[in-house]
Design a protein with these regions (language model features):
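Short acidic-glycine-tyrosine-enriched beta hairpin
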Residues: 64, 78-93, 210-227
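A short hydrophobic beta-strand segment most commonly corresponding to one strand
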Residues: 44, 90, 104-121, 223, ...
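Asparagine-centered strand-capping/turn motif at beta-strand->loop junctions
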Residues: 100-103, 232-235
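Short, conserved beta-strand element in jelly-roll/cupin
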Residues: 42-48, 57-76, 112-114, 177-181, ...
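A short, N-terminal "cap"/entry segment at the start of jelly-roll beta-barrel domains
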Residues: 1-39, 120-173, 187, 254
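Short strand-connecting beta-turns/loops that link adjacent beta-strands
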Residues: 60, 104-105, 167, 193, ...
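Short, charged beta-turn/beta-strand-edge "cap" motif at the junction between a beta-strand
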Residues: 95-98, 228-231
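Conserved short histidine dyad/triad with adjacent acidic residue
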Residues: 24-31, 43-58, 159-164, 174-192, ...
Length: 254
């Protein structure tokens, strides 16, 4: 049983139907209403075959998406990309994007917004071919290749950058993958000028956040509030988890 206020499981959150999508059911796991998040939002969407996100853009926020299962075709900057489980995608501010599921099984997608979206109709623009809008210049590739990095204070774990300013030009979010061996740990540090979410892919992560102990198993998310002192250690089996940071310049008011 989960007793930590910092750990949230998807089935603890009610589902909703997002705008600009078809055949999609979302659960907003990390947000203002669930954990008081002000700098980022994390949800999991379940999408049926042939459905997904219509072509739209978010003028004032960034979006990153990770395919947990299933397969589909994404489109960013007018470039199509076939995605399968384990792939990340990134949509910068103001860039039109879409996603359609191609697998027989429904796809599940982990989605990150920074700043938070919260289904604000003013934060989304549906594509209108009769009145195309200018977009930022596209990069050479929209594929995201992990970059190994060394994190001070992290022992016994391999860390890779998935999305940040250097790899994808992100201005409001950063995503890293941590592959930890048994006995790995991250020494206590204070989280400054950002909020942090851990998404546990495999194994279990234990630790403390804001003087409260937590234990998070595969499929759960841990929210670390801005200013909190936190640390982590691996469970009996070495875990794999994402570290998702949101550092939007102007956090939402509580």
């Amino acid at each position: 049983m989960n007793t930590s206020p910092h750990v949230v499981y998807p089935d603890q959150v009610a589902s909703y139907r997002p705008a600009n999508h078809t055949g999609t059911s979302n659960r907003r796991i990390i947000g203002r209403d669930t954990v008081g998040a002000r700098r980022l939002e994390v949800l999991i969407g379940t999408i049926s075959k042939g459905h997904g996100a219509q072509r739209h853009a978010h003028p004032s926020l960034e979006q990153a998406s990770y395919l947990l299962c299933g397969a589909g075709v994404s489109e960013v900057y007018g470039q199509q990309r076939h995605m399968s489980a384990g792939d990340w995608g990134f949509s910068p501010e103001g860039v039109f994007h879409s996603f359609t599921v191609t697998s027989e099984e429904p796809a599940q997608v982990l989605v990150v917004y920074a700043p938070p979206y919260q289904e604000n109709p003013r934060a989304a623009v549906l594509y209108n071919p009769a009145h195309p809008q200018p977009e930022p210049r596209p990069p050479l590739t929209t594929a995201l290749a992990p970059v190994p990095v060394c994190w001070e204070g992290t022992e016994g774990a391999r860390v890779e950058t998935i999305v940040d300013t250097a790899t994808a030009g992100a201005q409001h979010l950063a995503i890293h993958r941590v592959v930890a061996a048994a006995g790995s740990q991250g020494r206590a540090r204070q989280l400054k000028n950002r909020e942090r979410v851990l998404y546990v892919l495999e194994g279990a992560v234990e630790g403390q956040a804001d003087q409260r102990a937590f234990e998070a198993r595969a499929g759960s998310l841990v929210f670390i509030p801005e200013g909190a002192l936190w640390q982590w250690r691996s469970g009996r089996a070495g875990p794999t988890f994402f570290v998702i940071d949101g550092f939007a310049a102007e956090p939402l008011p509580i």
